[in-house]
From Swiss-Prot:
GO biological process: dTMP biosynthetic process; dTTP biosynthetic process; methylation
Entry keyword Transferase: yes
Protein residues bound to (6R)-5,10-methylene-5,6,7,8-tetrahydrofolate: 183, 282
The species this protein was found in: Tolumonas auensis (strain DSM 9187 / NBRC 110442 / TA 4)
Protein name in UniProt: Thymidylate synthase
Gene: thyA
Length: 283
């Protein structure tokens, strides 16, 4: 929690005003932020200085794992996080590649599970990684990436957290996640939970122990209409201790995650938090 608050304060103190062309808003921006999450000791990095809706973050992660490309499928899992980008993004609404209501296009999990190759076949990046790690294999290229510039025009949004690299030392699994851009008051809350949970799940289904998760952000920013709430409300609050994430031990394979796992298979214990803060969202 401290590293999150330190980053927010750093943006307030050192950030440079940048005009964002996509949203037509100004952002206070810093370059490079490194966060570390202790998955090994189950120090769940949920925000405590405001109420965090952790279930929506995990639901979104499950949708990525399953390769979903439709906001309705994400809603069925328990999150509305893709409704706006699928249905209110002006550029996407005009894009001939859009198939209709709730269509997201070839974003995130679609790339992770159905990457199109030069010969017209598909590559399941996540499936390959799980297969290797389950055998104790780390080829130094256990990389899951959603960043496919050749298909950016086929999706409603470029991936923000775009690449996850898994590393195996003995029977301990580590994760390094890379993010090109982060709306810190809103997006980082989701991203922290997802990085932590992704490592915990991957360790569990491959029979390894979770180690540390490293989260590297390039462009970290706070939008101009979020500054006052962050500076005068959230940063004035005292954080609570980190809670714990409980995952159903019966989840043992990628197929389990693809088929029967729901939000009921996750629980957060010991979560104390301050009141919710409604930050503006920029589409």
């Amino acid at each position: 929690m401290k590293q999150y608050l330190d980053l927010c304060q750093r943006i307030i103190d050192e950030g440079v005003w940048i005009e964002n062309q996509r949203t037509n808003k100004r952002c206070l921006t810093v370059i490079n932020a490194d966060l570390v999450y202790d998955v090994r000791n189950n120090q769940f990095p949920i925000i405590t200085t405001r109420k965090s809706f952790w279930k929506a973050a995990i639901a979104e992660l499950l949708g990525y794992i399953r390769g979903y490309d439709n906001a309705a499928d994400f809603r069925a899992l328990g999150t509305k996080s893709w409704d706006a980008n699928a249905n209110e993004n002006e550029a996407w609404l005009k894009n001939p590649a859009r198939k209709g209501l709730d269509d997201m296009g070839r974003v995130y999990g679609v790339q992770g599970r159905h990457w199109k190759t030069h010969d017209g076949t598909e590559l399941d990046q996540l499936g390959k990684i799980v297969a290797n790690l389950s055998k104790g294999i780390d080829d130094r290229g256990e990389i899951l990436t959603f960043h496919n510039p050749g298909e950016f025009n086929l999706g409603c949004l470029r991936p923000c957290m775009h690449t996850h690299t898994f590393s195996l030392l003995g029977d301990t699994l580590y994760l390094t996640s890379y993010q090109r851009s982060c709306d810190v008051p809103l997006g980082l809350n989701f991203n922290q939970i997802q990085v932590f949970t992704l490592l915990a799940l991957m360790a569990q289904i491959t029979g390894n122990k979770p180690g540390l998760a490293y989260h590297k952000i390039v462009n970290a920013h706070i939008y101009e209409d979020q500054i006052e709430l962050m500076r005068d409300v959230q940063l004035k609050r005292k954080p609570y201790p980190s809670p714990k994430l409980e995952i159903n031990p019966d989840i043992k394979s990628l197929k389990d995650l693809e088929t029967w796992v729901t939000l009921d298979d996750f629980n957060v214990t010991g979560y104390q938090h301050h009141d919710a803060i409604k930050y503006p969202f920029s589409v």
